[in-house]
A protein has these predicted regions:
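Eukaryotic protein-protein interaction scaffolds centered on beta-propeller repeats
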Residues: 19-103, 267-275, 283, 358-364, ...
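A short beta-strand motif characteristic of beta-propeller blades
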Residues: 90-95, 132-138, 176-182, 217-223, ...
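WD40/WD-repeat beta-propeller blade N-cap
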Residues: 94-102, 139-145, 182-188, 223-228, ...
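WD40-repeat beta-propellers
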Residues: 105, 123-127, 167-170, 209-214, ...
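Residue-level detector of Asp-centered blade-edge/turn motifs that repeat once per structural unit
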Residues: 109-110, 152-153, 195-196, 235-237, ...
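Conserved strand-to-loop turn within each blade of WD40 beta-propeller repeats
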Residues: 117-119, 161-162, 204-205, 243-245, ...
Length: 434
């Protein structure tokens, strides 16, 4: 795994300073690492070692900022080889029906279904309750689907076509009728829905921001000379945020006024400053999201970092560094305490925003760049997609992975295995007791 060496070094660095029951912490880390390096042709043993490490982690007085990361990775890798489809070379949490890069994944109003888009020109609808079922093709084009967005009510899906226009696709299908699709042929840089309204906002290739409605006249609400990568509209006050290729974050506040760019670079005052010796500079802004509380704007940049911006105070909160390449997508979970990021470094990461000392959970199983990620509506799962054409589902809570191991295996560690991988001085117990 690409991130395993870096992760291990981080773990060892933090562990060297751990003062809280180092014996248990060391045992959990050692067993997790041994499970990770155990070959896949010993799936039961690999899984039982990971599950027992989880039991020690859950029950013991373990150093909290290290072990959760190791435990999650070991549990995930162990689960990967339980029920592995060697014919199709696919793990239990992996599906693939796109023939090219997966560019977006989004959920609608029904938490059991999600949608994906690809450079192959298709938009597919997937059933989470039946992951091996064939997805429904709800839209198909000979153009590249740059991204998709869902309206707040979950009734309309927007497919943004690269260097082209967009398609508005009804998700409410009558079984006796074809899926309704409304085409907007005007070429756009990007687009988004207006929260709470039956309107959407586009950025024309010439830079005009145009507000459009299903039954209303189009209205220009802004203009920019910069290349816009993504739009985000604040649900609370209607402010439009635009992340640009030039690294400028523009904003249009209500009442909207058509002005020449730049409208407002809200990061201008600190762009040349340092943050813990870290030069901020100007790097392309690729993705934006606003926290459920409406107080924080998360900004993903080409540098591989995430800027957290205090919206009411208009000031920097902190910068999160960890990705080795461009951040491609970003999303808060429904509670606003976790942040999901994806990157061209081939990983997705889940960051705990309540404690900056906690290492992120690193989701490292894609073979290419990871372009998109999304929490499910309950925040219990993450869906990711990328350049390897596959979509993967990840539980946020490692307890699900631990439970699946015992559901898939009908044995426990033998005494000999316990002595080898746990320790002769530690009393034997059943890893899967139920």
């Amino acid at each position: 795994m690409r991130s395993l060496l870096t992760t291990t070094l981080l773990i060892l660095s933090i562990y060297s300073n751990a003062q809280k029951n180092p014996t248990t912490t060391e045992l959990v880390m050692s067993m997790s690492q041994r499970s990770l390096v155990m070959p896949g042709y010993l799936p039961d043993l690999k899984a039982l070692i990971a599950r027992q490490a989880y039991e020690f982690w859950k029950e013991g007085n373990v150093e909290p900022y290290v072990s959760h990361l190791n435990v999650y990775q070991a549990l995930y890798e162990a689960n990967k080889y339980l029920g592995y489809d060697s014919v199709r070379n696919m793990a239990y949490n992996q599906v693939g029906m796109h023939s090219n890069t997966v560019t977006s994944v989004v959920f609608g109003s029904d938490p059991n279904f999600y949608y994906s888009s690809s450079t192959d020109g298709k938009v597919l609808k997937w059933d989470l309750t039946s992951p091996r079922s064939i997805p429904e093709t709800i839209y198909e084009s000979d153009k590249i689907v740059q991204s998709i967005e869902m309206s707040n009510d979950g009734k309309v899906l927007m497919a943004i076509l690269y260097q082209e226009g967009l398609a508005l696709i009804s998700t409410e299908k009558n079984p006796h009728e074809d899926i309704k699709v409304l085409e907007d042929p005007q070429p756009v840089q990007t687009a988004t829905f207006i929260p709470g309204e039956r309107k959407y906002l586009t950025v024309a290739k010439s830079g005009e921001l145009i507000l459009k409605g299903f039954n209303t006249k189009s209205e220009q609400v802004g203009k920019t000379a910069l290349k816009i990568n993504q739009l985000k509209v604040d649900e609370q006050d209607g402010t439009i945020y635009a992340g640009t290729e030039e690294g400028v974050l523009e904003a249009w506040e209500k009442p909207y006024q058509v002005k020449e760019s730049p409208i407002e670079d809200i990061m201008e005052n600190w762009r040349q400053q340092s943050y813990f010796g870290y030069k901020l500079g100007s790097f392309s802004i690729n993705c934006l999201d606003i926290s459920p509380s409406g107080d924080i704007l998360a900004i993903g940049r080409d540098r591989g970092d995430i800027v957290l911006w205090d919206i009411p105070k208009k000031q920097l909160i902190r910068i999160i560094s960890g990705h080795q390449s461009t951040v491609t997508d970003i999303q808060f979970n429904p509670k606003g305490d976790l942040l999901l990021t994806t990157s061209r470094d081939g990983t997705a990461r889940i960051w705990d925003l309540t404690d900056s000392r906690k290492l992120p959970i690193i989701l490292d199983d894609h073979d290419e760049w990871v372009f998109t990620g999304s929490f499910n509506p309950s925040g219990t799962q993450v869906i990711t997609g990328g350049g390897d054409e596959y979509i993967r589902t990840w539980p946020v809570d490692p307890s699900y992975l631990a439970f699946r191991i015992c559901a898939m295996i009908n044995r426990n560690l033998t005494q000999e295995e316990w002595d080898e991988f746990v320790g002769r001085d530690i009393p034997y117990s059943m890893t899967c007791s139920d």
